[in-house]
C-alpha cells in the first residue's frame, strides 16, 4: 500500500485517565518494525477486560492509553522478517500470542506463549520498548499488544490470526477474545460427553459462549447458574435448559445441583471469577468422573479452599486460558465453525455503534445491557 513505511495519521479513542470517557483524537501511528504488522481496524467490540483496566481500580494504571483487543481488520503493511501474513490479509488481533518457537508453542498441550503471553502493564512494543502511537511527539501507550480502539494499530505478528477473507469481520471480530474463551473452555477443556449434564456459572458473554460450546458438544442438560434472573431467558438461545439462582435457595448451590442431577453434574464451567462460585463449581461435579473448569479471574488475594477428599473421590479441577486455543493455529478453525453454521455468532451481538459514539458501548456495559456491542470504525 502507498502508506507502507510512512507514519499514518488517524483517529483513535484515547483514555487520558482512569474512568474518564474516551476522547477521539488524531494520533500518529508509526510503521511496523521487525516482526510487527500494521493493521487497519474495521470493527472492534468492547470486552469487560477493557473496562476493568480503564477503571484501573485494582492494578497499575498506565495512561494515556488506547484500549481495545476484540477486533477484526486488514493488514496494511508488514515489518522486516514477517512472512506469515501480507498486506490485504484479513486478521483477528489477539491479546495473547503464539511465537511458534518457545516450549509452550511447541507443546501440543499449551497455548501460553513465553514471548507473547498477555501483559496488562506493558504499554510498549516488545521489540524496542517504545510505543507506535503518539500525539504531538508524546507517546500514547498500547494495551495488551493490540489497542484496537484506533483506525490503525501496530502489533507483533504473533498476535494476529489470519482468517478466511470470506468471513464477515463485523461478526467474527467477537471471536478474538471472550467468545472463544468460553467456547474453548467447554469444547477443549471440559469436553462434555454427548448426553451429559453441564453447569455454567455466570451468564455473561463468556458463560453464554461456554453454554454454546456445551450445546455444540452435545450436552443434554445445560444448567445456568446466575444471581441475575433477567439473564435466564436470553441464555436459552445458547443452549441452557434450566436455571438456578442461588438467592432462591437456603442451601449451598453445590447441594442444589446435586439434588437436581442425582449426585452432581458431569461437567461445570466457572465464568465469574468469584471465589465462592469457583469452589461451588468444583464441589458440584459428580464423584468418579466430574470435571470442573475455571475460566473467571479471581481477586488477587482470593484463596481456593476445599476438602482434599473432593479430589480423592475422583473429581477433577482444571484451569484454562483463552479456552486452550493457540491463537494463530486454532482461531482460523473457530472462524470456520461459524462459516459452516455450527457456531452461531450473531446472537452474541446485541448492539452496534459508530466509532464516534464508542462511549455508548461503555455505558451499555455499565448498565449490564446486551452481550456484545460492535464498534464500527467507518461510519
UniProtKB/Swiss-Prot annotation:
<dbReference type="InterPro" id="IPR013154">
    <property type="entry name" value="ADH-like_N"/>
</dbReference>
<feature type="binding site">
    <location>
        <begin position="295"/>
        <end position="297"/>
    </location>
    <ligand>
        <name>NAD(+)</name>
    </ligand>
</feature>
<feature type="binding site">
    <location>
        <position position="113"/>
    </location>
    <ligand>
        <name>Zn(2+) 2</name>
    </ligand>
</feature>
<dbReference type="GO" id="GO:0046294">
    <property type="term" value="P:formaldehyde catabolic process"/>
</dbReference>
<feature type="binding site">
    <location>
        <position position="105"/>
    </location>
    <ligand>
        <name>Zn(2+) 2</name>
    </ligand>
</feature>
<dbReference type="GO" id="GO:0004022">
    <property type="term" value="F:alcohol dehydrogenase (NAD+) activity"/>
</dbReference>
<comment type="similarity">
    <text>Belongs to the zinc-containing alcohol dehydrogenase family.</text>
</comment>
<dbReference type="InterPro" id="IPR036291">
    <property type="entry name" value="NAD(P)-bd_dom_sf"/>
</dbReference>
<dbReference type="GO" id="GO:0051903">
    <property type="term" value="F:S-(hydroxymethyl)glutathione dehydrogenase [NAD(P)+] activity"/>
</dbReference>
<feature type="binding site">
    <location>
        <position position="99"/>
    </location>
    <ligand>
        <name>Zn(2+) 2</name>
    </ligand>
</feature>
<feature type="binding site">
    <location>
        <position position="322"/>
    </location>
    <ligand>
        <name>NAD(+)</name>
    </ligand>
</feature>
<dbReference type="InterPro" id="IPR013149">
    <property type="entry name" value="ADH-like_C"/>
</dbReference>
<comment type="subunit">
    <text>Homodimer.</text>
</comment>
<feature type="binding site">
    <location>
        <begin position="202"/>
        <end position="207"/>
    </location>
    <ligand>
        <name>NAD(+)</name>
    </ligand>
</feature>
<feature type="binding site">
    <location>
        <position position="69"/>
    </location>
    <ligand>
        <name>an alcohol</name>
    </ligand>
</feature>
<dbReference type="InterPro" id="IPR011032">
    <property type="entry name" value="GroES-like_sf"/>
</dbReference>
<feature type="binding site">
    <location>
        <position position="295"/>
    </location>
    <ligand>
        <name>NAD(+)</name>
    </ligand>
</feature>
<keyword id="KW-0520">NAD</keyword>
<feature type="binding site">
    <location>
        <position position="372"/>
    </location>
    <ligand>
        <name>NAD(+)</name>
    </ligand>
</feature>
<feature type="binding site">
    <location>
        <position position="69"/>
    </location>
    <ligand>
        <name>Zn(2+) 1</name>
    </ligand>
</feature>
<feature type="binding site">
    <location>
        <position position="226"/>
    </location>
    <ligand>
        <name>NAD(+)</name>
    </ligand>
</feature>
<dbReference type="Pfam" id="PF00107">
    <property type="entry name" value="ADH_zinc_N"/>
</dbReference>
<dbReference type="GO" id="GO:0005829">
    <property type="term" value="C:cytosol"/>
</dbReference>
<feature type="binding site">
    <location>
        <position position="49"/>
    </location>
    <ligand>
        <name>NAD(+)</name>
    </ligand>
</feature>
<feature type="binding site">
    <location>
        <position position="231"/>
    </location>
    <ligand>
        <name>NAD(+)</name>
    </ligand>
</feature>
<keyword id="KW-0479">Metal-binding</keyword>
<feature type="binding site">
    <location>
        <position position="177"/>
    </location>
    <ligand>
        <name>Zn(2+) 1</name>
    </ligand>
</feature>
<dbReference type="Pfam" id="PF08240">
    <property type="entry name" value="ADH_N"/>
</dbReference>
<feature type="binding site">
    <location>
        <position position="272"/>
    </location>
    <ligand>
        <name>NAD(+)</name>
    </ligand>
</feature>
<dbReference type="InterPro" id="IPR002328">
    <property type="entry name" value="ADH_Zn_CS"/>
</dbReference>
<feature type="binding site">
    <location>
        <position position="49"/>
    </location>
    <ligand>
        <name>Zn(2+) 1</name>
    </ligand>
</feature>
<keyword id="KW-0963">Cytoplasm</keyword>
<dbReference type="GO" id="GO:0008270">
    <property type="term" value="F:zinc ion binding"/>
</dbReference>
<feature type="binding site">
    <location>
        <position position="49"/>
    </location>
    <ligand>
        <name>an alcohol</name>
    </ligand>
</feature>
<feature type="binding site">
    <location>
        <position position="102"/>
    </location>
    <ligand>
        <name>Zn(2+) 2</name>
    </ligand>
</feature>
<keyword id="KW-0560">Oxidoreductase</keyword>
<feature type="binding site">
    <location>
        <position position="47"/>
    </location>
    <ligand>
        <name>Zn(2+) 1</name>
    </ligand>
</feature>
<keyword id="KW-0862">Zinc</keyword>
<protein>
    <recommendedName>
        <fullName>Alcohol dehydrogenase 1</fullName>
        <ecNumber>1.1.1.1</ecNumber>
    </recommendedName>
</protein>
